[in-house]
């Protein structure tokens, strides 16, 4: 707990104009990943007042990262740096920094983090560019769903649904099951809010297919519940009931598992949405 608090304190001091005090706090942070994060944080804080002045500090952060021997720790520090560079609009630098990660999945995670910052800033076109560099459905779909939501809110439901359908298209790369629930939630929520009803069947079907890649049966149940709730909210009650039945069968095949009760609770929420309870 202490290190994140020190990092936040250093950044707040620099943002308030006390650069000297902030750097004193940075030097209290141990060398390695925490020091790299502290330097990244104060760089971004300084960059919010003077973007050019942040560059030397970002370079110090990169030098600190280069000295981290453990690869996964180094990748996490790079991911943090990418987000901070993105926050202050140094997008070219952030993109290039992400590609210092030499493994595909951690690099995609860094780009997803970059995309989330851009989405929070309302820079949707810039965020959408990143989908071409993130080959994993569960990650890229989160960005594409946010952009689709933006399109729908700008009265382009057709464009929104087209992007949501594309978000669930196979990419030829392995599907990372741990990212699928968030992706399904983002895509289905966006489709319900702003998508064309005529696109529902295709998108819901793709979402149902995607649930099959999940590694445990109870995770599949929760994914099917997400689909069923979306179907029910669209008034596709018969489809929702079929999806609920499929989820119910899978759940009871695993009634001895630890997550069985939570799976039943999830199914009951879908039944409520479909008017069955």
Task: Describe the function of each predicted region.
Residues 1-277:
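Non-catalytic tandem-repeat scaffold regions and their flanking low-complexity/translocation tails
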């Amino acid at each position: 707990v202490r290190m994140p608090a020190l990092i936040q304190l250093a950044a707040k001091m620099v943002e308030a104009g006390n650069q000297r005090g902030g750097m004193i706090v940075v030097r209290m942070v141990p060398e390695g990943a925490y020091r790299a994060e502290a330097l990244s944080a104060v760089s971004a804080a300084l960059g919010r007042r003077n973007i050019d002045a942040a560059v030397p500090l970002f370079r110090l952060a990169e030098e600190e990262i280069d000295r981290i021997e453990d690869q996964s720790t180094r990748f996490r520090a790079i991911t943090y740096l990418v987000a901070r560079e993105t926050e202050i609009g140094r997008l070219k630098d952030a993109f290039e920094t992400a590609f210092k990660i030499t493994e595909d999945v951690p690099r995609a995670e860094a780009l997803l983090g970059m995309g989330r910052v851009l989405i929070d800033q309302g820079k949707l076109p810039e965020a959408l560019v990143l989908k071409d560099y993130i080959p994993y459905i569960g990650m890229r779909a989160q960005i594409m769903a946010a952009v689709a939501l933006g399109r729908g809110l700008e009265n382009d439901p057709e464009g929104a649904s087209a992007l949501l359908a594309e978000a669930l298209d196979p990419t030829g790369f392995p599907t990372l099951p741990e990212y699928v629930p968030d992706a399904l939630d983002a895509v289905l929520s966006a489709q319900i809010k702003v998508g064309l009803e005529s696109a529902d069947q295709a998108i819901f079907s793709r979402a149902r297919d995607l649930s099959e890649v999940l590694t445990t049966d109870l995770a599949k149940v929760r994914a099917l519940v997400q689909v069923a709730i979306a179907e029910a909210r669209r008034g596709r009650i018969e489809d929702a009931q079929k999806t609920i039945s499929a989820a119910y069968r899978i759940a009871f095949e695993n009634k001895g598992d630890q997550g069985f009760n939570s799976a039943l609770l999830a199914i009951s929420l879908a039944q409520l949405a479909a008017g069955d309870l």
